[in-house]
Design a protein with these regions (language model features):
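Extracellular jelly-roll beta-sandwich "head" domains, especially the C-terminal globular C1q domain
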Residues: 1-145
Length: 145
């Protein structure tokens, strides 16, 4: 049977309408958590979050990436990537994501950071506005031996 280690959350914007900034080509940090992982191996980390995005342009997409071990964006630390189409609407939609990190090395604390960005990735065009809410959370457990 598995054993619970820690649960942490990070809320960047708790309401619709915030932060109210455009999605840019520069990855923007919207959540950081430091899970207390007690130097155990065989960890199961489940990461979940949601963002509110709005766009009046057809074909709008955005990307979310989760990095392990840093609060500064570094492509070498990316463990999860989501590329999402935005529904054409004058109102915002909320987009949820879930990832697991089954390869995290043993550490007293494991940091995870969530970034949202636009620009160009694989020839896709990213645009839109971050209109909230924005939240990121994670649960750490030790898997069965």
């Amino acid at each position: 049977m598995g054993r619970f280690l820690d649960l942490r959350s990070s809320m960047n914007a708790g309401v619709s309408g915030a932060p109210g900034v455009p999605i840019t080509a520069t990855p923007a940090l919207f959540g950081v958590i430091g899970l207390q992982t007690e130097n155990v191996s065989n960890k199961v980390i489940t990461l979940t979050g949601m963002v509110g995005v709005s766009s009046l342009l057809l074909g709008t997409t955005f990307a979310i990436q989760i990095c392990r071990g840093t609060t500064v964006y570094n492509p070498a630390n990316v463990i999860y990537t989501l590329v999402q189409n935005v529904r054409l609407s004058a109102f915002s939609d909320t987009y949820a994501f879930t990832a697991q990190d089954l390869l995290a090395p043993a550490a007293a604390e494991t940091i995870y950071s969530a970034f949202i960005f636009g620009g160009s990735l694989l020839g896709l065009l990213f645009t839109g506005e971050r209109v909230g809410p924005e939240v990121f959370w994670g649960i750490a457990s030790q898997g069965a031996p």
